[in-house]
Amino acid sequence: MTRTSVARAAVALLALLAAGCTAPTGPTPDEVTAWMDSQDDAAPPAGLLGSATGRVDAGVPEPSDPPQVSLGFETAGRLDGVRLSCLGEGSLDFDVSVTTEEAAGGTRTQVVTFADVPCGPDARDEALDATAVVGVGVTGYDADRAGAWHALVLGATGA
């Protein structure tokens, strides 16, 4: 073997190894935007208090503080649950921050984590049972690729 053929073989081997170690590909920014728009354009379900949509970056293992999207309600209501979805394959973790009015006039926030919500065409319903709700925040995180998430907040106001 000549030096040239050894060098070419080494370069080919390195290229092959590098190809096997690349990060998983995700949707393009245009695909993410189109998916987010389609979620916002869908017919609202009964009992919709609000919706939240956000982008997620790969390799962010911890939730943001404060939540990525926060919804506030002028009149305290009842929270029945959330419908969570995310773009692509894999899974995503969600933190849902529920802020309630306290009897003494202050507020209290509790964070509920929904881990490993599968991404794909089907949304996942998660039950929550809270009254006197004045705000809900949502954060999606711990993705293995860039993408997006969507959450529908379900319940009733004035309850």
Residues covered by each model-derived region:
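Extracellular/mature segments of secreted proteins
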Residues: 2-3, 28-29, 93-98, 125-132
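Short, surface-exposed beta-strand/strand-loop-strand elements in extracellular ectodomains
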Residues: 90-109, 149-154
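Sec-dependent bacterial lipoprotein signal peptides
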Residues: 1-21
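An anionic, turn-rich surface loop/hairpin at beta-sheet edges
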Residues: 64, 100-129
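Short edge beta-strand/loop segments characteristic of extracellular beta-sandwich folds
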Residues: 72, 81-87
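Transition segment at domain starts
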Residues: 24-73, 155-158
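Noncatalytic modules at the cell exterior or secretory-pathway interfaces
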Residues: 77-83, 124-152
